[in-house]
Structures are given as structure tokens and as C-alpha cells.
Amino acid sequence: MAGARGYRSYRGRGSKGKIILAVILVLVIVASLAFIRMQEYVVYDESGRPRLSLPGESAEQTPPEEEEDVNLVIQEKTSKTVRAMQLSTAPLTVWDGAVLTGGTYTDQTCDAVAVTMKDAAGHVYFDAAGAVSGAVRTEAGTAAALEALNAADTHTIAILSCFHDPLAANADVEGMGLKNTGGYIFYDGSNSQWLDPAKPAARQYLCALAEELAKLGFDEILLTDVSYPTEGKLDKIAYGTTPRAENLAAFLDEMAAALEPYDVTLSVELPAQVITQGSDDAAGLSLADTAQRADRIYAAAAPADAAALADQVEAAAEGTDFAVMLTAADTPPQEGSWLLPAQS
């Protein structure tokens, strides 16, 4: 039945209002998301004012902080040329600089003196705290003579025999001695004994002696017998697992580290054939490995061969000096470093 005249039943709000509300809600959501998204592209200038930096726009790069200048100091080998005279192997009891005037050898004046501080028998010719028992051989005036020597205006060279050392090898066979494959001390072709370069205690023994010499004031330390034995039943030597050349290189590295606090030249004697051939596998010697770790290389050779040997040393390690070790009958070369033998 129809309703009363003039009235209609109420049907609620129209659908148009709902649509408007939905549109407004969507716009609010989109605006919020856009605001959040745009925060990623807001940057601030030096005054703190914000600005918009959109993708693809060339953003102003912040200038990098100025780096302080770094002065890189590279210490080059600066070994000067030396013309040295070697004194007799014995405890030094007196020092007289007049011995360097040349004597019977040459009309050239020597400017350096070499003194044996440890020989190939293991004898130590100074009051070394670290020497094995019975190795030290000194006289009453030795300490005073060494002090006077190193106080003089003369380049002083301490000769230190290294691994050929029967005294130290027998004093501590297990810790320092070179052994044979049977587990006993090795005897070379001259019935002598050696320290084992593979054993840290043997290397440390030599480094400690060298450091004592540096403390005495020597300007240069010349290492001799830096090798394995090359005579005798070499196939009976218990070399261990580390290559011989690596053991000797490790020794020279440790020696350099021990002497680093002191202003001292580190020198090594090599056989001349190691310089000409480049290596000696039996001895464990490599010219390159040795020359790169030393300031000066010494080798016994004729004066006429000195220049060629010096060139080969220089080629192996730029800046490493070469000194020829002469005989009593030799006339020293006019150029380069050399070492005269002890006067008889």
C-alpha cells in the first residue's frame, strides 16, 4: 500500500558523498607516501637550508677534506767506499792508527781497519757476555784498546765468523749444532763442526754477538762463513725440511733487525764464484738474497776482477757496495773498496 501523501521513506545519504570521502582518503594516503619518499632526496647546503635533489640531477659534490702532505722517507744504502787494513787475528792489546799509513803494501793510505772479533774456530776476541763457555780470549788491555780503536776517527770493521764454529756447536749440539742423519754432530772434510742455520738458537747466538759489537762502537760488521759446509760427506747432513737458502736469508733478516737500532754497516763475505754464477746450492748461498740484505759484499779476488764483480753485485742489488779482499802480493785498485790482509 502506498504511503501517506507528501512523504517518502528515508534511504540514507547518497552514494556521491561516499565517493568524495574515498577520493579524499586516497589523496591523503598518496600525499603521505610522497612526502616520505621525497625525504630521501632532501639535502642541506652549507648554511643548513634544505633543498630537493632528484635522481639524475647533478648533485653538488662535497669537496674532499684536504689531506696532509705525507713525507715518505726512503732510506737508501749509503755505504761509503772503504780502503781497509786487517789486523792479525789475536786479542787486541793496543791501538796505533799509524798502521793505516800503508806500510809495505801500497802508497795509498787506508781509511779503515778490520779486526777479527770471532774466528772460524769459535774464539771470541772481546769480553762478550753471550759467548759460550771457553770461547772468549782477551788480554788485560783488550777492552781499553777496543775503546780507543772505536773512539778514533777511523772506520772500524768487526769481522765475525758465523756458522763455522766448533766451540758453540759442541757446547749445544741439540740447540745449535749441525747434525748428521744419524743424530750426531756433523764433521766436515777438515774434521770440524758447524752451527746449524736452521736452528733459531744458533742464529740468535750470532745476532747477540753482533749486537754486542755494535754497542762497542764498530762502524761495520763483516759476517764471514755465512753458509753450510761445502766439504765432506754432505749427503750425511741432516738439513731439515726448510731450504738452505731460506735459512740463511732468515738469518740475515734477523741480523739486520738486531742491528737496526745502531748506525752500523752490515757486510757479508761471499765466494767469488757465487757472485759470478749467482748461487751455490750446496752452501745455500744466493747472490740476490744476500746482496739485497747487505750494505756491502766482500769477496777474495784478483784486483783485475774487482770491477766486474762490483758490477754483478750492483746488478743483483742496486746500491750495495763491493769490496775486494786482496792478498799480500796484490796492488790495490785505484777505485772501489778493498781490504788488505794482516801484515806479517
Describe these PLM feature segments.
Residues 1-17:
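N-terminal Lys/Arg-rich, disordered targeting/topogenic segments
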Residues 20-37:
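Hydrophobic membrane-insertion alpha-helices, especially the h-region
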Residues 37-43, 293-344:
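Substrate-binding cleft of secreted/luminal carbohydrate-active enzymes
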Residues 68, 102, 119-161, 231-266:
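Aromatic-lined substrate-binding rim segments of carbohydrate-active enzymes
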Residues 73-92, 163-211:
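Active-site-adjacent "subsite" loops/lids of carbohydrate-active enzymes
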Residues 98-124, 212-222, 288-298:
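Catalytic domains of carbohydrate-active enzymes, especially glycoside hydrolases
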Residues 112, 138-186:
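Glycine-rich, aromatic-flanked loop segments that form ligand/cofactor-binding clefts
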Residues 155-164, 222-223, 245-283, 317-330:
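Aromatic-lined carbohydrate-recognition surfaces of secreted/lumenal glycan-active proteins
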